[in-house]
């Protein structure tokens, strides 16, 4: 468990360091100095978050699952892929990792005025047109989408492309959400920068904690009751300790084969050979004495 917690701490720290660091670098230097358009800066920031998550998943995916996001860990706990205690431990180290990552950014850029903190209204790229309601709706929907993809992809047996799919999904939601809120979908990514930036970023932080959690819960429930393939209650059996993922025709055929296989041993239990031996013994014991008695009676009559 210690290895998992350390992996989550380091992974979240790197996510904030490279993701938010790219946002700060682009907005502070590239966008202002070279007058690059907003869509291009959005693309750079989105790809930065997606690529760093892909790299993190490739490195620590086999160790901790590479959640690096409290919303993902909460969804995993709801789906019973981890215990509540494990989920709490994951969330704590993820938040700490995000704080350390933001602290490193402040040291690198020589200040804490801009660390890629999330926000709406005056803090967003669209300005005052982004209201509180808009920010909540955007964050809930984006987190729902991202966490749902994580749940579906991580449940598959072939995990070779998981990191790429999840990373591209994170880049996609960033492309959509950056103008509205800067895109959080991850409370640990928002907490660290907001703590050091303070001001409106800190006062608006609750939105980027509550909305992603709500989106994660909705995604977990949708996955559980709509997408997830469950074992049928009619036929309770296991095939190589895996859940059935076949069509209804195969499911009905498999029990029939198993029932036939179970009937054959029942027929073999009836032993016919011992029964024949018992009959032979009874016949020999009855006939032998009868012959001897007849022979004796005949000899006695002749003597007389």
Language-model segments: residues:
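Membrane-interface helix-loop junctions and terminal tails of multi-pass membrane proteins
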Residues: 1-287, 291-304
